[in-house]
Amino acid sequence: MDRAHIQLYTDGACSGNPGPGGYGAILRCGSYEKVFSAGYATTTNNRMELLAVITGLEAIRWAQADVTVWSDSSYVVDAVEKGWVFSWEQKGFAKKANADLWQRFLAVYRRHQVRFVWVRGHNGHPENERCDRLAVAASQEKNLLVDVGYTKEA
């Protein structure tokens, strides 16, 4: 059986850092599209960028899909593509910001074949621009969620 080929577009936003934040994600497989967004009262831009990726990957129902993640976050893309997150994991995420989210990321990352593509933010990439609008709108909602993993050190 052929693997599903999925495109996952993501972005995070934060007004102040820390401050209210949100993420947006678009998951596409052929003509299927699912859109995700959520806002948090106090968080960071890096947490929202990473949570966008996690949320999209967790939504994939196909086993062992081929996933291309499009992100403007050097933090997320470099951590994976340069292998940093795997060395952080080997060291038990000691003193690493966002360890809760990186552990959650690795659990879902390993279910699929995932590659990351960095895109320049605010540069006219249609899906990145759409995810940015989703993230900003989510961060401005009235009833923002609590980012339970956020700490001032993160």
Regions found by a protein language model. Name each.
Residues 49, 53:
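Short, conserved alpha-helix that lines the donor NDP-sugar binding/gating region
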Residues 22-29:
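Short beta-strand scaffold segments in enzyme catalytic cores
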Residues 10-20, 54-130, 134, 139, ...:
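RNase H catalytic domain
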Residues 1, 20, 32:
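Metal-dependent phosphodiester-processing active-site neighborhood
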Residues 31-48:
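A short, polar/acidic, helix/strand-boundary loop motif
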Residues 1, 140-154:
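Acidic two-metal-ion nuclease catalytic site recognized across multiple nuclease folds
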